[in-house]
Amino acid sequence: MIKSFGLLILRLSIGTMLIHHGYEKTADIQNFADAFVRPIGLPFPIISSYIAAYSEIYGSWLLIIGLLTRFGALAIIGTITVAIYHAIVTAGFNIYLLELLILYFGGAFCVLCYGGGEFAIDRFLRKFRIKFNRPHLPFE
């Protein structure tokens, strides 16, 4: 029970702290592409920017509500990995830039490994599936 409560706090913390970054990206996608995507040489900067923004938005919402939790964590891990790469390429191993990114990465990785816990919609769906003998859900 304490593990599930800890996972709930972790999911809510990561989701609520990270979701605004995605919304900020969508507010000025061109500026984000120019400042963050083009310097590291990713192809199709505008499309890559939209992918990053919506990965953060939808990944955060999935973590917050506990639906397809591992898929949401994987989306966040992908975006944060690119952000870590950007921070290292542009500023070197500056711990002040990397520490928050590494915390997001570590938290999302824990959710990816352990799932959403007892207080997630995923758990309710799993119990429903077992009760009615349904096939497996993706990302369990």
Residue ranges and their predicted role:
Residues 26-44:
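Membrane-interface interhelical connector segments
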Residues 1-27, 46-54, 58, 65-140:
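Extended, low-polarity transmembrane helix blocks
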